[in-house]
Amino acid sequence: MQRIILLLLIIFNLKSFSQTVKVVDFDTEIPLENVVIYNENKTIISHTNKEGKVNITEYLETAILSFNHIGYVEFEILKKDLKQVHYVVKLHKKSLQLAEVILSVSRGVEMKTRIAEQVSVVTASEINQLSPQTSADLLAVIPGIRVQKTQLGGGSPVIRGMEANRVLLVVDGVRMNNAIYRTGHLQNSITISPTVLERTEIIYGPSSVIYGSDALGGVINYFTKTPEINKEKKVNLTYLSRYSTANDEKTNHVDLELSLNKWASFTAISYADFGDLKMGKNRNHDFDDWGKVFQYSDNTNTFYNPVGVNNPNPNLQKNTGYNQLDLLQKFYIPLDKKSDITFNIQYSTSSDIPNFDNLAEVTSGKLRYAEAYYGPQNRFLASTNLHFNPDYDWLEKGSLIFAYQQIEESRIERRMSSLDRFYRYENVDVYSLNGDFSVALNKLKNRNLSYGFELTHNEVASKAFGKKIAVSGNQITGFTRDFVIQSRYPDGGSEYSSAALYTNYRQDLNSKSTLNTGIRFTSTFLKAKWIDNTFITLPDMDIDTENKAITATLGYIYKPVVQWQINALISSGFRSPNIDDIGKIRYKSGQVTVPNIYLKPEYAYNAELGIVRYFKNKTFQIDLNSYYTLLHNYIARGAFEINGQRTLVYDGVTAITQANINFNNAYIWGGTVGFSGKLIENLKTKGSLTYTKGKSYDKKLPLSSIPPIFGDVELNYTFQKFQTGINYRFNAAKKLADYNLEEGIDNIEQTPILVATGKYYGTPKWNTLNWNTHYLLSDKVSLSFKIDNIFDTHYKEFASSISAPGRNYIFSVLIKI
């Protein structure tokens, strides 16, 4: 009898010892990770794992447990009452605006209600719902951002009328912008797979106090997933598979998280294969042949054809497909209770990416290029991120990030019926060290000081050569000889470095207002050397420049009542010319860009006002952000002479010379109005409308990269495990008179031609209707189905060479084990 009683006691104790609660979303019943659970005096604190589970054995039966998660309403319950809800806690979403924590504005954690800057956040769950093919496609659905595409393997984000090297890209605290980030259009955002993103944050407008050079139009911060120490579950496996019909996309992704007692690991592999892209068939713009591909080149590395091939389906954009491989490896190691270190390795590579812009160019009815493609676009990053919380009087917490990046780019071209093939290769090594520190200056933590430094060093190697191919029939059998061609950047090597210090102060003046101010000093250094003067001789073939800049910001947040928030901001930014600005030699559309060794920095002075109005207990909001930016000494392409000459022979073609030049002043102004929130139970909506205007004061010409009015509206319905939504996207027309025709950045030649006048029309207006649905088969398996561009509309995004996808059916499955 004693043994039976003892056995029953053991069973009872085991049952008590293994008390586990599962926390899920009230609407979707999706398990919630990182929910914080604590008792009344917070002597015991726990967190849910990826399955939403947490062990609550150590809490007293009489304890009141509080369940807290960013984005959800706090929930309290007596531990002994959990049995009545079957140990399942369902949390209700609260207003997104109240919940948002911003990581990028001060390079640390800050509530959005204490930030004057306009900021957008996209979470991992939203990324899963959007299911974008690339990170560029992800940016295209964020309010206030347009994405230009020269080819399928690309995507150049435009923020507040600025793009390329006027927009700063950052991944895991490391700046991606390097010495050869160019003006015009930049495609590097695709080198980060959206499948590994934990969140993406966009800061709109000049942010040079925290981020330094290039942060004029805004900052795009990518945060990749990081492993955690998890006592509940040691292994987490995720698999994603997606198929899209418009370009025969096949994406497969797998990631594995291992959590041990003293360290954790996250490994991710993503592979995407994209076929040729089909454009829409319905031409509401009434230009019957605009964008159609009637002929294409079937030339390859080994196959020679002196003429183009007729395309049996002109709506299929031949020579657009490519594939891409992305790898991510992270190790997280807690060193002690006050410090931890994260090792981060990223690698992205691709196949050759066809340059559709060139391959589709037709001259006198014939294709201009037989071969035009980018070689594999390789990006490697290795970083070490040390976090520490010493809690000193002058340093409460901080981080040090040391990073190394290697970027490889190449361009291979051969004109139709020519035997001369041109090769240009660029290699960039980037070293950086960032230190970011913060401290609360009082016990209430309403006075905060942050400060830090940044050191970067870029080394650029550029080489170029030509080879004459040997042909037998239609086969390329080898090469007959080599010949000299002009390199894209200085062939003697070049370097670009920066050093900066900053400080930022934030104070809650009272319960209704917050003041923020900051200042940064940055110094940049550039060295470049040209050796070969076969084609071009500069006034100085060996240059050494240094530029200095002080930037500042002043922000004020005022909340007169609970329903209103007013943000005012004055800020400045700058961009120091890099190697691409000063030293690039490049041909396009009859013009060749040549070096200008006398180029100086450009500056931006910005004023903006933001207003937020909340409704229905902050479950719905309307917001307005307006701004005016003055560009001083701004850099743009213009007519330029080399040794008194306005022409130059480039790859055997005589072209008119131009260069990046400093002009006096220009302005950009505009704004975005948006709304988001709950209409009724289970039904949510959001939308935005963006207007941008830019013009030079001295030349009285429109600025490049200024998109027409654009916006979107969407409705989303959620019921338990089912979610569905519709999205309407629209874009106004941009007329010829609103284009800058001097620079050639906006690709006016990619717009339709009016038959009556023979002039370019500009970008026609367009709109698309899109539908998506998601269903949770279980807490481990979810299915998604989308139809983009339901009416199969033909259109091109502003300044794009490639037509947008036509009707696109997208199927995906997500499995978490």
Spell out what each predicted region is:
Residues 511, 523-524, 627-630, 640-643, ...:
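Gram-negative outer-membrane beta-barrel transporters
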Residues 349-351, 406-410, 523-534, 544, ...:
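Surface-exposed extracellular loop regions of Gram-negative outer-membrane beta-barrel proteins
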Residues 245, 369-391, 490-494, 541-559, ...:
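Outer-membrane beta-barrel signature, preferentially recognizing the C-terminal barrel domain
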Residues 334-348, 377-533, 549, 557-560, ...:
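Face-selective signature of the C-terminal outer-membrane beta-barrel domain
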Residues 85-90, 135-138, 155-158, 169-170, ...:
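N-terminal periplasmic accessory domains that precede
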Residues 247-273, 284-351, 378, 443, ...:
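Transmembrane beta-barrel wall of Gram-negative outer-membrane proteins
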Residues 176-206:
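Short acidic/polar hinge/loop motifs at secondary-structure boundaries
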Residues 36-40, 68-72, 84-128, 164:
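Short, acidic, small-residue-rich periplasmic hinge/interaction motif at the N-terminus
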